[in-house]
Design a protein with these regions (language model features):
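N-terminal capping/small domains of soluble enzymes
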Residues: 1-99, 104-109
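Context-gated lysine
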Residues: 6, 15, 29, 46, ...
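Alpha/beta enzyme core
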Residues: 94, 106-257
Length: 259
């Protein structure tokens, strides 16, 4: 890997600036048949909670003309299985790349307990705090829309985790800057912009809503969030979600142009 691609994310050195987005990449093993996770600067695993979660009932996705609606519900094996099961953290640690563990919880104490346990796992290079998921009844976005709640949560995790902390922010606020500053004040080393947008389509056959938006139209909104915040704080802001072909250039461009 070319030396010129090396970059830093807080105190964490990456061999290149490309990281997988949480939720789109599973835990690495899901994509091994068509891409080697080791080519990335880091892999960000799907969200992990203190206890296992089954996720939302099927169907969980809904295609629209301009993007995909999803309501996965944070299905995951829980922190115990994530640490001990060979399919999860042990397998992620075998890749030649940085390992970022995405955490989600209903309470501050849940985030703290997971951070405390992962601090003793040498394979974990960084935490990404999911304080922005719109598809869960408790926690998640409840923290990420309130600057003070964001600061308290990040601060509590910072006291229990000694390495890099990334706060994953929500776009579903009027102004993301106060949330970003609160995360920074709490001890976050970097920000991940942004989680899915709240959206709704209606299944007219069942008269039911389909929620949470990602993909094509999101790539027109998320660069604005990142560029606006970069101009405000001149921070490194990792982008979130998966995009086809050369669209990633729009994201890196909006950051570098603003600095």
């Amino acid at each position: 890997m070319a030396e010129t691609l090396k970059t830093r994310l807080g105190s964490l050195e990456l061999k290149n600036p490309i990281l997988s987005a949480s939720g789109t990449f599973g835990y690495g093993k899901e994509v091994e048949s068509f891409v080697d996770p080791s080519v990335y600067g880091g892999i960000v695993g799907k969200s992990i909670s203190l206890e296992p979660r089954k996720g939302n009932p099927l169907p969980r996705t809904w295609e629209t003309a301009s993007g995909m609606l999803n309501s996965i519900g944070l299905q995951n094996p829980g922190i115990d299985a994530f640490i001990s099961d060979p399919s999860y953290l042990p397998r992620m640690s075998a890749y030649d790349t940085r390992v970022v563990v995405n955490l989600v919880g209903d309470t501050v104490d849940e985030y703290v307990e997971m951070a405390r346990r992962l601090d003793s796992e040498a394979a974990v290079d960084a935490l990404e705090l999911n304080i922005s998921c719109p598809n869960c009844p408790l926690g998640g976005m409840e923290f990420g829309i309130d600057p003070e709640a964001t600061r308290r949560l990040v601060e509590a995790v910072r006291e229990n985790f000694s390495r890099t902390i990334i706060a994953k922010l929500t776009p579903n606020v009027t102004d993301v800057v106060p949330i970003a500053r609160a995360a920074e004040a709490g001890g976050a080393d970097a920000l991940s912009l942004v989680n899915t947008y709240v959206a709704m389509a209606v299944d007219w056959r069942q008269r039911r809503p389909r929620q949470s938006f990602s993909h094509q139209a999101k790539r027109k909104n998320a660069p604005w969030q990142s560029g606006f915040l970069s101009r405000s704080r001149h921070e490194q802001n990792p982008q979130s979600n998966g995009y086809p072909r050369g669209n990633a250039r729009q994201f890196t461009g909006c950051i570098h142009r603003s600095q």
